[in-house]
């Protein structure tokens, strides 16, 4: 994993040299991509172009379920909330976590009446029932509040430390895995966990990591294998692969555009500044 981290740091250096994040509309389309892939993993059927049209112009995709549109608009609003909270160095608390979850589930959450009480997923309430995913049985609902309080306290301490890019990246992956393993909500845990990962990356001014929808099977396998073996290195390696994939794609996109621009100018060097075309 150390070699992979070194490769990632070299890619980050190249990424920064190209000033990719300064490109016109780069951040907007990057956030759209995060929304598209994260919701697609959870079943949303809109294409990437349909996601862009929905978030850019409010246009719905013909023949696609309303639920899938709601998932995407809610996730986008939650991502903007996470961005602002991280940029303001907002302490990571249980209340902040619930606010993120409430935004993710705002349009698709429901009130649940159980023998243990009533909870509302659209309000970011913790589950009051036990949940399973395949062969995995997550922690008893009665333990969720205490575990989340501990999770938030430890994350808040870790995130506010003077740490380097490697440490911040690994922290974001570990938080992603640990929150998903607690599974505090009845629904939306995957999306919320990926947003918490993005919160840490925003906080430390790192490019955001995507989990690509094409790699959903490997993503689930990494989660399962990590739990079975109690070895977080498995999930870290998978996420580093996703991060490398994202960085390489962005760098390649810019380099290809540079080549096209250079050819159009007869091989003359480009002026400083980049424009990305989507």
Language model segments and positions:
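FIC/Doc superfamily catalytic core
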Residues: 1-278
């Amino acid at each position: 994993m150390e070699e992979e981290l070194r490769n990632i740091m070299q890619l980050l250096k190249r990424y920064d040299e190209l000033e990719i994040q300064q490109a016109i509309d780069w951040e907007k389309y990057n956030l759209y991509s995060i929304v598209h892939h994260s919701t697609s993993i959870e079943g949303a059927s809109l294409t990437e172009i349909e996601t862009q049209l929905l978030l850019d112009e409010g246009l719905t995709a013909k023949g696609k379920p309303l639920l899938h549109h709601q998932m995407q608009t809610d996730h986008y609003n939650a991502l903007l909330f996470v961005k602002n909270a991280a940029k303001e160095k907002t302490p990571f608390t249980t209340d902040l976590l619930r606010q993120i979850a409430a935004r993710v589930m705002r349009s698709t959450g429901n009130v649940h009446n159980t023998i243990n009480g009533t909870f509302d997923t659209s309000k970011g309430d913790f589950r009051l029932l036990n949940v399973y995913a395949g062969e995995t049985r997550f922690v008893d609902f009665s333990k969720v509040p205490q575990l989340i309080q501990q999770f938030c306290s430890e994350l808040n301490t870790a995130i506010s430390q003077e740490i380097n890019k490697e440490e911040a990246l690994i922290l974001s992956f570990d938080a992603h895995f640990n929150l998903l393993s607690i599974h505090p909500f009845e629904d939306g845990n995957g999306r919320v966990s990926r947003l918490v990962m993005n919160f840490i990356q925003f906080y430390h001014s790192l490019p955001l990591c995507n989990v690509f929808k094409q790699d959903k099977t490997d993503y689930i396998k990494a989660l399962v294998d990590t739990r079975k073996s109690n070895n977080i290195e498995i999930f870290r390696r998978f996420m580093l692969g996703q991060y490398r994939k994202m960085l390489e794609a962005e760098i390649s996109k810019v380099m290809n555009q540079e080549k096209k621009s250079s050819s159009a100018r007869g091989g003359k060097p480009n002026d400083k500044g980049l424009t990305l075309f989507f």
